[in-house]
Amino acid sequence: MYRTNTCGELRLSHLQQTVTLCGWVQRVRRMGGMTFVDLRDRYGTTQLVFNRDSAPAELCDRAEDLGREWVIRATGTVMERSSKNPNIPTGDIEIAVGEMDVLNRSEVPPFTIEDETDGGDDLRMKYRYLDLRRHCVRSNMELRHRMALEVRKYLDGEGFLEVETPMLIKSTPEGARDFVVPSRMNPGQFYALPQSPQTFKQLLMVSGFDRYFQIVKCFRDEDLRADRQPEFTQIDCEMSFVEQEDVLSTFEGMAKHLFRTIRHVEISEAFPRMTWHDAMKYYGSDKPDTRFDMRFVELMDVLKGHGFSVFDSAAYIGGICAKGAGSYTRKQLDALTDFVKRPQVGAKGMVYARVESDGSVKSSVDKFYTQETLQELRRTMEAEPGDLILILSGDDLMKTRKQLCELRLEVGSQLGLRDKNKFSCLWVVDFPLFEWDEETKRFYAMHHPFTSPKPEDIPLLDTDPGAVRANAYDMVINGVEVGGGSIRIHDSALQQKMFELLGFTPEKAQEQFGFLMNAFKYGAPPHGGLAYGLDRWVSLFAGLDSIRDCIAFPKNNAGRDVMIDAPSVIDEAQLQELFLELIPNEN
């Protein structure tokens, strides 16, 4: 037996017991005739003591020679520490070591294996196996494990079956780019890695598996952000004989179960619901952060037509009221202006107005507006003395709202209104079924081609497709879309109509999705579902800024795994075996 206990379990109740521990040397300290070694494993850290007054000199000499991250086994007696460490669970005890074996030496690690490390992102990604030894990273993996267990426990209790679907599937042109896999046995043909198990879970509904789930890897070849990776994990679910209300109730229940069991937060009230239209109107985003208010107020009637050309020519003027921010200095306001003018935001500038202690309003465009008009602005914004009004305008309604959204989030962060330990959950519902692309002059499915329109909007498919609302819904927590889904189309004729509106010829629709259309001919039940992003849930509960920190071996922002150096070139023999030839990139 290599060990009798772990480095995180010994307490005062174990005093005088002889134990054997294994782990990695965190640090070595020498004080007089004593050497202290912090020994670490997955479970915690325990202090080892080598005392020259009671232990063999040869053993103490070897202890002094130990290096960081050496792997050792130590046997000794559990003793009470004279100088306790309240910061760790094992801080009341130490091990007086009588025997020690070095199981493996280590080179000096390229960065310190501590929560507060000196290693940069790139270096830690290259040596991810060392980064995973850090407690803060390891705890994210443990959180992920516990969440996956609770997901399975909840869904099993609700009668769901976990069914695995294929990883090598057919490529479809809609949505993000596919990762493709050449087939050696079928020259010139390719599989795709699934962006989601969407069509397979619908086929399972046709098969009679009325409640399905799986925790599944999905793949999308798209530009990366803090909340995106080329491969990610979904909690994928589907239900038969349900309406939207049934799906929302089931998965709101799962969210509450996770809050209760993982975060120990009890949520009794129902999640509020907001239409997509209201989310865009008041927050400029279909995933609004509702931890704080600061809703948009349209100001066209108040500010247009007063000789200020920027506003007079605008298609939209919107403002937010930052409560208590009237003390912002000119330097802070200039920094906010620079923020909205960054290419990532794209605004041309920002106008501000502050409400003074006497109720008067002082603005950055005073020469264009009378105090009477500024007081009307104050009333419209419901601003009080000490408040700050921030205003953006533009000639594109949706674009300007998105810019105002970025400003709102930035100000919310500056004012401490986005506490990671406070959670605000809601459903966003009634999405548009289609979105119009000006460049290609065609409709695209806002979610996917299998989303059902609201029954009362079906007649609009022939007259005004852009006005059709979808039976779709997203769960949003703290401005993060943690999951989304829809009621699916289960009628072949309606599905065919959907394909036509999306620009599919009957031949193309049959080529891409004929297997699903054929299945619908054999009695497809009404069905719907949802997919949660497990990575996003974990990062939310862990208070992380990026999902990368809750994935064991993530890719960097260029989609590369710098640890194993992937993607990489393959041998010419492999290319020939796959009947592939590389064309030089002239760029």
Curated annotation (Swiss-Prot):
The reaction(s) this protein catalyses: tRNA(Asp) + L-aspartate + ATP = L-aspartyl-tRNA(Asp) + AMP + diphosphate
Residue numbers binding L-aspartate: E174, R220, H447, R488
Locations listed in the record: Cytoplasm
Gene Ontology biological-process entries: aspartyl-tRNA aminoacylation
UniProt GO cellular component terms: cytoplasm
Enzyme class: ligase
Pfam families referenced in this protein's UniProt entry, alphabetically: GAD, tRNA-synt_2, tRNA_anti-codon
Any GO MF annotation of the entry: ATP binding
Keyword Nucleotide-binding appears in the UniProt entry: yes
Coiled coil, from the record: none
Similarity-based family: Belongs to the class-II aminoacyl-tRNA synthetase family. Type 1 subfamily.
Function summary: Catalyzes the attachment of L-aspartate to tRNA(Asp) in a two-step reaction: L-aspartate is first activated by ATP to form Asp-AMP and then transferred to the acceptor end of tRNA(Asp).
Known partners and oligomeric status: Homodimer.
Protein name (record): Aspartate--tRNA ligase
Native organism taxonomy: Bacteria, Pseudomonadati, Bacteroidota, Bacteroidia, Bacteroidales
Gene this protein is translated from: aspS
